[in-house]
């Protein structure tokens, strides 16, 4: 796919040049074009308040300590393929219209096969990928995105949808990922991008810079408790007291950890810069204990 921008008198010669080059190379076929588009008006209005429920998955990496996110996607092709598989299931579940956001910042309506190909290519080339699904009748918007160095986020915004339904769908999506590739997963109104990139209330309680540059430790630490998360046995070894939480063993290394009452965590829609009830979050932090990568803990570990 080529992205060409400009006036007709500028664009047409380039198109003819591409056609000649393809012909000279023995390629046969037809060049087709499509205009760049933006999200439909109803979707822009629906997403204006920015209260999105998200599920984030951090993948195991094969890189050493001190990985620089600018180097691209850290986990490798198996995790990349898992991102695409999980992401496409998420986007197509409600049969909405698919939009690809290419690495060149141009958006196009595409079919599922093209969306899958573009996600794969963008993750391979830069590590950053984004696609969306829009269902006008359901007033439903879904996104799948990646965050360097090794995370993906599924997001959902549906008009008048009970929070329980969205949480159930996000939980099912998380548990559909191949757990042998997963370091950490969680559901909340903040996605991994917000945790790693934004200075939000409560971010002083964790070291996001150390976390971003050490994805090899994601299977040992989290930045903040969520109402629902998938943790590893390495996480649990650092916990203070999870007796007040519901825990479900998923495999030999992963455990689903959920608050016994999910309503305080999810019933009230929040923007990314808004936090749950302070008392609720403080108690969760005490329960999680050294699972949280605090600035002091990061300094002790030399991260």
Q: Where do the language-model regions lie?
A:
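Internal, hydrophobic cores of structured domains that mediate oligomerization or house catalytic pockets
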Residues: 58-196
């Amino acid at each position: 796919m080529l992205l060409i921008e400009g006036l007709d008198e500028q664009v047409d010669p380039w198109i003819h040049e591409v056609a000649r080059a393809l012909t000279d190379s023995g390629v046969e076929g037809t060049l087709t074009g499509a205009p760049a588009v933006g999200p439909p008006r109803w979707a822009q209005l629906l997403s204006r308040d920015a209260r999105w429920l998200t599920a984030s998955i951090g993948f195991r990496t094969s890189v050493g300590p001190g990985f620089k996110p600018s180097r691209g996607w850290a986990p490798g092709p198996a995790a990349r393929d898992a991102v695409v598989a999980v992401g496409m299931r998420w986007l197509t579940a409600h049969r909405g219209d698919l939009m690809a956001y290419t690495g060149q910042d141009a958006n196009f309506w595409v079919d599922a096969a093209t969306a899958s190909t573009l996600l794969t290519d963008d993750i391979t080339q830069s590590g950053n990928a984004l696609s969306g699904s829009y269902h006008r009748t359901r007033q439903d918007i879904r996104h799948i995105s990646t965050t360097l160095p090794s995370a993906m986020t599924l997001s959902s915004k549906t008009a008048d949808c009970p929070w329980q339904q969205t949480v159930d769908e996000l939980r099912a999506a998380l548990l559909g990922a191949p757990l042998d590739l997963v370091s950490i997963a969680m559901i909340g109104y903040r996605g991994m991008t917000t945790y790693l990139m934004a200075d939000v209330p409560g971010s002083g309680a964790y070291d996001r810079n150390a976390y971003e540059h050490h994805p090899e430790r994601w299977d040992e630490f989290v930045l903040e408790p969520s109402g629902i998360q998938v943790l590893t046995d390495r996480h649990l070894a650092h916990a203070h007291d999870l007796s007040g939480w519901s825990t479900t063993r998923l495999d030999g290394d992963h455990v689903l950890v959920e608050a016994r009452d999910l309503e305080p965590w999810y019933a009230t829609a929040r923007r990314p810069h808004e936090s749950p009830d302070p008392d609720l979050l403080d108690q969760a932090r005490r329960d999680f204990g050294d699972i949280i990568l605090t600035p002091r803990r990061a300094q002790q570990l030399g991260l």
